[in-house]
């Protein structure tokens, strides 16, 4: 079957939304996130058509370190297993190389054998396993611990972030986006105003890459963990937002215990991040 690939735009975004809402009716976000994808990111939203019919979509987004993040892969149920996903991956790889991305990455659930197999077919391999835990903030009011302020000095922010790097096993996660730890990611988090600390050097990195209205994400925290999580819950609630999520390596028993103490509910299963390092042309 031959497919036509076209770039997503405001002219055809309704077709892309239709694909997602048929594919994942309970996990849609493209309708709410179209402006961010089309206006605020480098990288194309690709749509696949069979004749005039939209059958699949996928987004490549360039992250702060220049890597290509492969997201929003959706193939309508009747078209799965018919090469639509392969066509999107081939386009992603071509685009990432043209953008000189040093790597490409994606995430999927640990039980999604088809998704992992497709990624492996295009040279991606396992880079990490993470689990999420979420606190619903609609049931009670939280008080903000005193002393947490945005970190104004990037050098200080970098020291804090590097101190938590090993515990996060070299990725920080927001909105199911896995950012490789390093200078470019640290600067992005700091420039976005996401790094907070108190005078005792307890710190939390909290914000959202996108879809802020659905809640915030703690990418990393350090020091007095319970104090940091109390700050994260109260700060999120102050913004009028309904939930805050933390993602971390599941074998970290200390983080798990702190989250459970503070009322976070863990996801039923883990997610994996897969990665391929790309060779530079020339």
Task: Give each language-model segment a name.
Residues 62-70, 80, 205-219, 266-270:
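A conserved beta-turn-beta hairpin within the catalytic core of GNAT-like acetyltransferases
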Residues 47, 53-61, 69, 74, ...:
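Conserved beta-strand in the GNAT
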